[in-house]
From Swiss-Prot:
SUPFAM superfamilies xref list: Family A G protein-coupled receptor-like (SSF81321)
Entry keyword set: Behavior, Cell membrane, G-protein coupled receptor, Glycoprotein, Membrane, Receptor, Transducer, Transmembrane, Transmembrane helix
Gene name, Swiss-Prot/TrEMBL: SIFaR
Record's keyword annotation contains Ion transport: no
Source organism per UniProt: Drosophila melanogaster
Function: Receptor for the neuropeptide SIFamide. Modulates sexual behavior by playing a role in male sex discrimination. Also involved in promoting sleep.
TM segment ranges: 105-125, 213-233, 255-275, 283-303, 324-344, 387-407, 437-457
Listed GO MF terms: G protein-coupled peptide receptor activity; G protein-coupled receptor activity; neuropeptide receptor activity; neuropeptide Y receptor activity
Effect of loss of the gene: RNAi-mediated knockdown causes a significant reduction in total sleep amount. It also causes significant male-male courtship behavior although a number of flies appear to behave normally.
Protein name: Neuropeptide SIFamide receptor
Cytoplasmic compartment residues: 126-212, 276-282, 345-386, 458-758
Length: 758
């Protein structure tokens, strides 16, 4: 967002024919011949210089004094003295070093100048440099005159030691100032760009106010929105997915742009000199380059993650790999932009602008620009490191990834009307929604930065910029810089379209705590972006294949449920389910996975029943999960018989729990069970025949069991053995764990309709 920098190209001005140039005269100690208006001005100055014997001291790089010293025709008088116009060549400063040029002549020149410059001539950087002093020795000391305050005759008298007559002449002329600033321009090098001559402000007050409002809106929306995105992902464990990690990284880069670069860009669009000092001149361009590079590389990582997930579901990107990639993104961004840190520096305004542009302020003014060592081509670095590495090449790679993703999704056919086909369609629809959102993020990124890159490329690699082009660039440049900055606040608006982020934003707004966990949980952060979705796609295609055990997946997670106020049982399994998954949508809109399992289990009476089937009389059922197989069984007993459940861990853990007798079959069957799995899939079947709404949650290879009474979980890697007798049976329940710890929690106070998750 830094403006293109360059050195001064001193432009040769066209010759102009002097028009009528009336000027005021006054009585002075040393008379000056009266000149004809306009036509005689140049001759008068030449004669004065010739009399001084110092015509050759008129330096080159002449600023068109006819434009600079437009005589005020309202004065209606022609007088002595004048200025050299185009015939004197090209000089930005007139150096008169002979006592023959008296302060009267100088006063006449100053009068015509101050009568035609701005009321606040401090805005005039195009200066008339003239030197003269009357001295007893007859020599004049050369000094540069900067017309900085036309209303202050004391300034000139003190600077040049003028006579009282000349001082009064300047004061009188200052009271009748009339000028037209259209001819007064700065000359900026890269393309002979003529900047407005105002040494302090680039734009009018009205335009500056418009820029302030626009930048403040971007600052507030971007800072709050990106902070919300980071908070949603960090505070909700279910949002911590690979894709969301890259989105958080993108939000961090946007916050850096907003905090460090946005205010500096606004100040640079209002003021001509650099107002923030040497350290910020080094730091701001560097942080801007780092943050933009990190944003681009994060978008590349997201597109590659989606591409791999769609084309090769088995080659998943783990969270550990995602963290390594994020570290690599920042290392590359920090290294590739080091030249901005080294070669941006403060440059005095006198070295940047032509000799005529001499600042009249007491403190020297500086500009923040690129200062490359001799023999180094800074344009080449811009071409390779910025335009190609941070824009053209990344955008091409991202476009290719999403085109291939779209081809894969659009050509995939799901025949039939089975429940499995319906589930696949819903999965595919969810993936397409996520891809559309990410594509929108990329397109807006390209459009936001495109105008600024085009302008920089035109300035650095194009021909000389004409006056008309400069007038356009002067208005377009701040808008292009604002568009690039506004990209930092667009992404949170796009994320709010996603239901999970929208709920997370609402939860943060309602939450009083800024650091606690959100009560909002959903099954996935962004549908189809989690690791489990890739696994489920694999199981559809390779149902009999057993997934390898992964250390990263061996996660136990116990929720502190606010409704039940107790720990839930968690069981981690690594077995494989040989059947398909069905997708179900509950009342809350979360898409859940149900298992269709054709294996069988035996109840206490030895009857073989299919798993996941519900009889109308509420008979015993079994539950199974994807990525681990868990079956649940209970025995119905007559009134008066007690229940003695035994949880047996074949690894060496067993527990006998006695229950009170007298429980009836109906009271047992009326108990509601809830099962929750994470990063795999579990199905839930109610014991009662009437339709009930069930809620399932998934997250990371963990299954949880919450019951109002003692129950039984069985891992379907090995058969479950039921111990029965001839007498009225006391059912023995067996619970087996494989490779992670099992926690079991129960409550004696029944809560039938308590939701496990808010």
């Amino acid at each position: 967002m830094m403006a293109a920098s360059g050195r001064i190209r001193k432009r040769k001005h066209k010759s102009h024919t002097s028009g009528d140039v009336p000027s005021t005269t006054t009585s002075v100690p040393m008379p000056i011949p009266t000149m004809a208006p306009g036509k005689m001005v140049a001759e008068t100055m030449e004669e004065a210089a010739a009399l001084a014997g110092d015509y050759n001291n008129f330096t080159h790089n002449f600023v068109d004094l006819q434009n600079l010293l437009s005589f005020n025709e309202l004065n209606g008088t022609s007088g002595s003295g004048g200025t050299a116009v185009s015939s004197l060549g090209s000089s930005s400063a007139i150096k008169l070093n002979n006592s023959a040029i008296t302060d009267t002549l100088l006063g006449t020149v100053l009068t015509t100048a101050t009568a035609t410059v701005a009321p606040a001539a401090s805005s005039l950087l195009a200066t008339l440099a003239a030197t003269t002093t009357a001295s007893a020795r007859g020599s004049l000391a050369g000094k540069s005159l900067a017309i900085a305050d036309a209303t202050s005759s004391t300034y000139y008298s003190n600077l040049l030691n003028l006579s009282p007559a000349t001082t009064s002449l300047i004061s009188a002329a200052a009271a009748t100032k009339s000028y037209n600033d259209s001819a007064l321009r700065w000359e900026q090098l890269d393309g002979s760009v003529d900047f407005g001559f105002d040494p302090l402000y680039r734009h009018s007050l009205a335009m500056s106010m418009v820029y302030c409002v626009a930048y403040i809106v971007v600052f507030l929306v971007g800072l709050i929105g990106n902070s919300f995105v980071i908070a949603v992902v960090l505070r909700a464990p279910r949002m911590r997915t690979v894709t969301n990690y890259f989105i958080v990284n993108l939000a961090i880069a946007d916050i850096l742009v907003i905090v460090f670069c946005l205010p500096a860009t606004l100040i640079g669009n209002i003021f001509v000199p650099w107002m923030l000092g040497w350290l910020m001149c080094k730091f701001v361009p560097y942080i801007q380059g780092v943050s933009v590079a990190a944003s681009v590389y994060s978008l590349i990582a997201v597109s590659l993650d989606r591409f791999i997930a769609i084309w090769w579901p088995l080659k998943q990107m783990t969270k550990r790999r995602a963290r390594i990639m994020i570290i690599g993104i920042w290392v590359i961004a920090l290294v590739t932009t080091i030249p901005w840190l080294l070669f941006f520096d403060l440059v005095p305004a006198e070295e940047v602008f032509s000799d005529a542009l001499v600042s009249a302020y007491s403190q020297p003014q500086f500009l923040c620009q690129e200062v490359w060592p001799p023999g180094t081509d800074g344009n080449l670095y811009f071409l390779l490191a910025n335009l190609v590495a941070c824009y053209l090449l990344p955008m091409s790679l991202i476009t290719l990834c999403y085109v291939l993703i779209w081809i894969k999704v659009s050509t995939r056919s799901i025949p039939g009307e089975s429940k499995d086909a319906q589930m696949d369609r819903m999965q595919q629809k969810s993936k397409v929604k996520v891809i559309k959102m990410l594509v929108a993020v990329v397109i807006l990124f390209v459009l936001s930065w495109l105008p600024l890159y085009v302008i920089f490329a035109r300035i650095k690699f194009g021909s000389d910029i004409s006056q008309e082009e400069f007038e356009i660039l002067k208005k377009v440049m701040p808008v292009a810089q604002w568009l690039g900055s506004s990209n930092s606040c667009i992404n949170p608006i796009l994320y709010s379209v996603n239901k999970k982020y929208r709920r997370g934003f609402a939860a943060i707004i309602k939450s009083r705590s800024c650091c606690g966990r959100l009560r909002y949980y959903d099954n996935v952060a962004i549908a189809s972006s989690t690791t489990s979705t890739r696994k489920s796609s694999h199981y559809h295609q390779n149902s009999s294949r057993k997934s390898p055990s992964s250390k990263g997946n061996a996660v136990s997670y116990i929720y502190e449920h606010n409704s039940l106020r107790r720990h839930n049982m968690m069981l981690k399994q690594d077995s494989n389910l040989s059947q398909q998954m069905l997708l179900k949508q509950d009342s809350h809109g979360s898409r859940q996975f149900l298992i269709k399992q054709e294996s069988s289990c035996s109840d206490a009476s030895g009857i073989r029943r299919p798993l996941c089937q519900q009889d109308s009389n509420g008979s015993k059922v079994s539950l199974s999960k994807q990525d681990s197989i868990v079956s649940y069984m209970e025995a119905r007993r007559s009134a008066g018989h007690g229940l003695n459940d035994t949880l047996v861990d074949r690894d060496s853990v067993s527990m006998d729990v006695g229950r009170r007798q007298g429980a009836t079959p109906s009271s047992l069957l009326d108990k509601r069970q809830k099962f929750v799995k994470q990063d795999s899939v579990i199905s839930f079947v109610d014991q009662r025949p009437e339709q009930r709404r069930h809620q399932l949650v998934k997250q990371d290879s963990v299954i949880s069991f919450a019951d109002q009474r003692r129950g039984l979980l069985h891992k379907q890697d090995s058969l479950m053995a039921n111990r029965t007798g001839d007498a009225p049976t006391h059912h023995v329940s067996i619970l087996k764990k494989t490779d992670s710890q099992l926690s079991y929690g129960s409550s004696t106070s029944p809560r039938r309709n308590a939701d496990l998750y808010e």
